[in-house]
A protein has these predicted regions:
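Conserved N-terminal segment of class I S-adenosyl-L-methionine
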Residues: 1-110, 117, 127-132, 166, ...
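Short, glycine-/aromatic-enriched active-site segment of Class I SAM-dependent methyltransferases
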Residues: 21, 143-168
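Short catalytic micro-motifs in class I SAM-dependent methyltransferases
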Residues: 115-122
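Helix-to-beta-strand junctions that scaffold the AdoMet/dcAdoMet cofactor pocket
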Residues: 123-124, 137
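Glycine/Thr-rich phosphate-binding loops of Rossmann-like dinucleotide-binding domains
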Residues: 124, 150-151, 199
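Conserved helix-to-beta-strand junction in the class I
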Residues: 132-136, 143
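A SAM-dependent methyltransferase catalytic signature shared across enzymes that methylate proteins
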Residues: 176-192
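Short proline/glycine-enriched turn/loop segments at secondary-structure junctions
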Residues: 187-188, 222-226
Length: 238
């Protein structure tokens, strides 16, 4: 993995830029994310004895997930941003530990389940990153934003906002995300769309748009995602 590219992609998380734009590190979305994780695990009857999250942020996802797993399950979170690590340390316990580090600090074959949630789009050399993640555990669960749609291309401010406010370096469709995983050596076991945008409406305009998205999605899910966006991709891989 290119060390210069890695350093460039990590800079916003180390110099406080990301913290300034996202002061709670998206912790408020954690219960929703955990519900999507559990949906996938239950679909495949996966009951991990050990879980690692790469890019664990403020640590709330692992804390929320822990209460839904066997009490003996060991959970570890790795995060490169010191600000987030300090927040996550407050959430640690006997079976839940957080570390200041990245994918290179996780031992190969060290867990049953690796979580990589809303991380891939932030990594400059994302293909090198995916190759590193591949051998860390048995199952890998990715959550990837689908930023490219007809709407986002027509509204040029949409992708620019993803870059400047959310620090997305790469933009995906469902097909390009799945292809990237397959081309870096993964076997895709299952995937589904997640309503990561439509479930959160903080203005009446967004509520109207998201209601329309939900209606269209119920009829033509793939077409809705390609045209209107508003959904992300949850992928289980080996």
């Amino acid at each position: 993995m290119n060390t210069e590219a890695l350093a460039n992609s990590e800079r916003p998380y180390q110099d406080g830029s990301y913290l300034e734009q996202n002061p709670d590190w998206h912790a408020y979305r954690s219960p929703w994310k955990v519900s999507q994780i559990l949906k996938m695990l239950r679909r495949h009857q996966i009951a991990p004895a050990s879980v690692v999250e790469i890019g664990s942020g403020a640590g709330e996802v692992l804390l929320q997930l822990q209460s839904n797993l066997d009490p003996s399950c060991e959970l570890r979170g790795y995060e490169i941003a010191e600000h987030a690590v300090q927040l996550s340390l407050q959430r640690g316990n006997e079976k839940l530990h957080y570390f200041h580090g990245g994918v290179e600090d996780v031992r190969d074959n060290s867990c049953d389940l690796v979580l990589v949630l809303d991380v891939v789009e932030h990594v400059e050399d994302y293909r090198g990153f995916l190759r590193q993640v591949r051998n860390k555990g048995t199952f890998k669960l990715f959550h990837i934003p689908l930023d490219i749609s007809v709407q986002s291309v027509l509204r040029t401010s949409s992708l620019r906002q993803r870059r400047t406010e959310n620090f997305h370096l790469h933009f995906f469709t469902k097909d390009t995300a799945l292809q990237a995983l397959e081309e870096t050596g993964y076997e895709v076991v299952d995937w589904f769309y997640t309503p990561g945008t439509v479930d959160f409406s903080d203005t009446w305009r967004k509520w109207l748009l998201n209601s329309f998205r939900k209606l269209c999605f119920a009829i033509r899910p793939d077409l809705t995602v390609r045209v209107l966006s508003g959904y992300q991709l949850m992928v289980l891989a080996k």
